[in-house]
Swiss-Prot record:
Annotated segments matching region Disordered: 1-39
Basic and acidic residues biased stretches: 1-36
Organism: Enterococcus faecalis (strain ATCC 700802 / V583)
InterPro entries associated with the record: CsbD (IPR008462), YjbJ_sf (IPR036629)
Name of the protein in question: UPF0337 protein EF_1180
Disulphide bridges, residue numbers: none
Family matches, as Pfam families: CsbD (PF05532)
Protein family per UniProt: Belongs to the UPF0337 (CsbD) family.
Length: 82
């Protein structure tokens, strides 16, 4: 649930940043334009970091499953040897 809220917040920041950037361009306010670009870029970075974290978590879960399968195979092998 927290991840969903984080992704929502990132999307909201991206939209707000894009709006500030557009406002800065229309009003020729370079500060507002840069603020918007920064906010939008930071939202993108946070989103990419969440994706990377999700990929790492998924990889760790797959590795854990493979290790468990390996232990089960070893257990079965030693059980049959007796």
């Amino acid at each position: 649930m927290a991840d969903l809220k984080g992704r929502f917040d990132d999307a909201k920041d991206k939209v707000e940043g894009t709006a500030k950037e557009a406002q800065g361009k229309v009003t020729d306010d370079k500060g507002k334009e840069l603020e918007g670009k920064a906010q939008s870029t930071f939202a993108d970075v946070k989103d990419k970091a969440r994706d990377a974290g999700d990929d790492l978590k998924e990889g760790a879960e797959k590795l854990t499953d493979k290790v468990k399968e390996g232990f089960e195979d070893l257990k079965d092998k030693f059980s049959k040897d007796k």
